[in-house]
A protein has these predicted regions:
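Acidic, glycine-rich A-domain
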Residues: 1-4, 8-318
Length: 318
C-alpha cells in the first residue's frame, strides 16, 4: 500500500506486506452481504421520517443555492427587472442585466471516511452506515460525487505483522505493527444503486477491529488528490483517538496520535483538500481544526447535513 503523501518521517511501519485495500463486496459472500443490507434496511425504517427530512433539507439547500447564484449589474445577459424603476426615474441610466453563475458545488467530490473500529460496534456504526446511505443518495441527486471508505485492521493482536516481528527477533520500536484493512464501500464513480448493498457490511460481526487513523486519512487523501473535481472535501467520522494495542505496546504511547496530528495538519495547511471531522461521543478538536462533537449518535445525520450545507455556501473551510 504505497502512499504518495510522505508519512514516513519519524513514523515507522514494520511491514506493509500484509496490508490490504479491499472492495466491500470481496469481504463476504453475495448472500451474506444481501442479508446484512436487509438488516440495515430494517433499521432504516425507524429513521425513515428523519431520513426523508434530512435528504429534502440538503437537497432544498443545494437547489436554492443553485437558483440563488446570480451575477448582477452586467452589460449583457437577462434583463434585471428589479432595476427598471431607476430607468423610469432617469432614462439616461443604462439597462442592467444579470446572469446565472456556474454552479460550483457540481464540481465537488465528498469522501466520507468512517472509523470501522471495535468501539464503533452497535448503534454508532449503524447510524454511520445509515448516514452514509442518506448522504450518497442525496448528493448524487444534486450531481455531487461521493466516495465512502472505511478503515480497520485485519486482525486483533497485530496479526501476521506481529508474528513476523516475533520471528525476526522483536526489534525495538518497530513502528506500526498490525495488518491494515482499508475498505471501499462506494467508489466516487459508482452509483448509489450499485453500491448500496455494500454499506450493510459495516454491521458484519467481527469486521470492526483496531483503528490506525493517520494512515487511513493518508489513503483517503491520496485517492481524493487524483480526482479531477475542483473542490475536494474529506469528512471523517470517528469516535476518538487512534488505537492499536499491538502497535502501542511496543512504541511510545502517543505514536499513532502524533502521526494523526501531523497528517491532518499537512492536509489543513498545505493541500487543496478540505478536511473536517465528526466525533461520536468524543471531542476530536485536538486533531482537527474543523471538528464537531455529537453526544448522541442520533444527531449524526443532522450534523452531517448542516456541515455539508454550510460547506456548499461556496466558502472554503479555514
Amino acid at each position: 500500500m504505497g502512499s504518495e503523501m510522505c508519512i514516513r518521517d519519524r513514523y515507522k511501519i514494520f511491514t506493509t506486506e500484509f496490508d490490504e485495500v479491499a472492495k466491500a463486496e470481496s469481504l463476504d459472500t453475495a448472500e451474506e452481504i444481501q442479508k446484512l443490507r436487509k438488516n440495515l434496511d430494517q433499521q432504516l425504517t425507524s429513521f425513515q421520517d428523519l431520513i426523508t427530512k434530512l435528504a429534502n433539507k440538503l437537497q432544498r439547500q443545494l437547489m436554492a443555492k443553485q437558483n440563488r447564484s446570480w451575477e448582477f449589474d452586467l452589460e449583457e445577459g437577462l434583463l434585471d427587472s428589479s432595476k427598471l424603476p431607476r430607468i423610469i426615474i432617469d432614462p439616461y441610466n443604462s439597462l442592467s442585466f444579470k446572469k446565472e453563475k456556474d454552479l460550483d458545488f457540481k464540481d465537488t467530490i465528498v469522501t466520507l471516511l468512517i472509523d470501522n473500529s471495535g468501539s464503533m460496534r452497535g448503534r454508532p456504526i449503524t447510524i454511520a452506515a445509515i448516514c452514509a446511505d442518506i448522504l450518497s443518495r442525496t448528493l448524487e441527486r444534486c450531481s455531487v460525487k461521493v466516495e465512502i471508505l472505511g478503515f480497520t485492521t485485519k486482525n486483533w493482536k497485530g496479526g501476521k505483522s506481529r508474528q513476523e516481528w516475533n520471528r525476526l527477533g522483536k526489534t525495538k520500536n518497530p513502528g506500526r505493527l498490525n495488518d491494515l484493512r482499508h475498505i471501499i464501500y462506494k467508489g466516487a464513480d459508482s452509483h448509489w444503486r450499485q453500491s448500496k448493498k455494500n454499506l450493510g457490511l459495516m454491521l458484519k460481526e467481527g469486521l470492526l477491529k483496531e483503528n490506525i487513523d493517520g494512515e487511513a486519512i493518508t489513503w483517503a487523501f491520496n485517492r481524493l488528490k487524483k480526482r479531477k473535481e475542483e473542490r475536494k472535501i474529506l469528512m471523517v467520522i470517528s469516535d476518538g483517538a487512534p488505537v492499536d494495542d499491538s502497535t502501542l505496546s511496543v512504541n511510545s504511547g502517543d505514536f499513532l496520535e502524533k502521526n494523526l496530528k501531523k497528517i491532518v495538519k499537512f492536509i489543513e495547511n498545505k493541500s487543496e483538500v478540505e478536511i473536517l471531522a465528526i466525533g461520536i461521543g468524543h471531542d476530536v478538536s485536538r486533531y482537527y481544526k474543523k471538528a464537531i462533537k455529537i453526544s448522541d449518535v442520533q444527531e449524526l445525520g443532522d450534523v452531517m447535513i448542516d456541515q455539508l450545507s454550510g460547506l456548499f455556501e461556496n466558502k472554503k473551510l479555514h
